[in-house]
């Protein structure tokens, strides 16, 4: 549609309905907003999950370390109880006081948390002490134990006072009491390992307050902590460990801050991206309107318009061109050479012209050619090709305008018919060349037969003929006759129509036969044929004559390519080698090579690089190779020339022939 509002007077602005104007809901524009919300949600969930994971891991570690501290302290208290029980048993067994004191001193030296050991008789009188001196804090416990008259199964603990606890053990039911005083702060100081002390403060407390504590620095009230009942052995007490502030708190805070900053940056980037997307969409809308205007102008033309890139692939066609060739734009755009509207009779000429466009300078050109419509009819057209230059000044392809000049080219069609007649004559000349080659091959054995026959007649004329020499002459005549017959049979097998026969085939023998057939042609064009067989070549299942036909065709093509174009050497080498589960035959010539324009359609029918070629040889060769489940490919040769590679599979062991 056209919009005449706004802009200079008389100017018309082309718009496309639905592309410009307000949009009620633009789902694509909401994608960045959804991404922003999703990103913020994911970052928040990640931070929460990391914090929860760290907290759970810290709680689990705190509980584990608390259990370890509890077991360590309980073990040490058990050691003190065990010493007290042994001293009581020794005293009841009648051990001397001197021996008991010596054992007590040994225990005190090894366990400094045990402040002293004392013995009381059945009346509660102190009879010995290590170190010497009374212990008034334990008198009440001793009287209580003696008054009960019972023999407890384990030492009895008294109350904790000033960080000390007294434990007592009866010597016997009628005997005295052995008493030990243990310092809880000293026990914490001595028996807590350094790695616990570096991470935690340890405290033993009851309802009255802290009884003993070890902490290398003040502990915050909100610090993580874990408490475990320490009753028994100490009645009403609790063992508690408290974590210091995490040393990597600053690192965690920095990491979280970095994540938050990156999240903010990502959000800002998405906001900017969202705004840029909106501006870009508005620009795209304007561009679509401009393209619609230009498309309307192009579709109004009666001249066919066609754009293609440097390789010949079609980029654009207008309606007039589609009507010209009878094909839809969808069938043409993106299509590579050869084009469906190319006339088969002019395929070689068209390919040559495409090569000139690719290899030549980007200057305008004009030529006439023939197109084939989709209904099979052919039309004569005149094409004007001009370089397609992009906004950066680079040559991107060619823009062509095509005009139908069928009615004006009746005379040209007659001339082309004459050209086709000349082409058929050229093919007959090729057959004549084959006859010449056959005559050359037969000339040598026939001349040898004549020579041996003359020698045999001379031997017969002698008075006493040498039968041995005569026999040798006849044998050589037979060999030369077989050689001549082999030449005739080889050519006959090569040209006659026959059914393929697959059998075990020695490729080295087939290669030798192919080289012998093409040797005269090579000598005529001063080309040196050479074979290179690498390693042991396994046999393949193939038809001997068909594979020989492929090799002869490829070798002959290489020789003729070296004869017609500029060559980079005089050698044509055929290399036979094994490549994994296949055998490769490489025919390497020193000709001018194959251009990119021809390479894409080299194996198509009617495609040839020779001036008199029919363009069917390589297509037939590929069909023969594919019939043997192989492949035929080509590529450039190092130093100049072309390499054609035939790949044939090697039958697996046990596979049917």
Curated annotation (Swiss-Prot):
Residues 365-417 form the PAC domain. The modification Phosphohistidine is found at residue 440. Residues 289-361 form the PAS domain. The keyword Nucleotide-binding applies. Residues 52-252 are periplasmic. Keywords: ATP-binding, Cell inner membrane, Cell membrane, Kinase, Membrane, Nucleotide-binding, Phosphoprotein, Transferase, Transmembrane, Transmembrane helix, Two-component regulatory system. Its main location: membrane. Residues 407-422 are annotated as: Inter-domain linker. Member of the two-component regulatory system DctS/DctR involved in the transport of C4-dicarboxylates. DctS functions as a membrane-associated protein kinase that phosphorylates DctR in response to environmental signals. This is C4-dicarboxylate transport sensor protein DctS. It comes from Rhodobacter capsulatus (Rhodopseudomonas capsulata). The gene is dctS.
